[in-house]
């Protein structure tokens, strides 16, 4: 309980300093929150095709490689990207759809691989939770096809499949 008394005493000292600093501020200023302007866009105005185009432009600004594919040809598109990048081995989350996995590439399912093990794998292949066109941001949620966070951080290359309906123009 000695530690608790010390923390409580320190708390009182800090609060006392705050009260002293605010002693000459009128009560009205302390309780009234100023109105904040909300002039930013809360909703997008682009068509679905425009949203995808904007995302592609922003992603390319980050030097991302983009390959458009139908759902049924994702595995072929991934194999093409792997060939372009010289990727011989991929780590994937267990929940990644089977048809996204390319043929001709060594695919290792991640069941808790250590960081050192991941460091020896060329690339990770994951899905995404969402993507934001305005910023070119990809959101991973650490679940399902996104896999563990380490998959997008440790291998030198991250290949991410983003479905068109997952791309939003902006976030309110």
Regions found by a protein language model. Give the residues of each.
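The feature marks the mature, well-folded catalytic cores of soluble enzymes
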Residues: 1-172
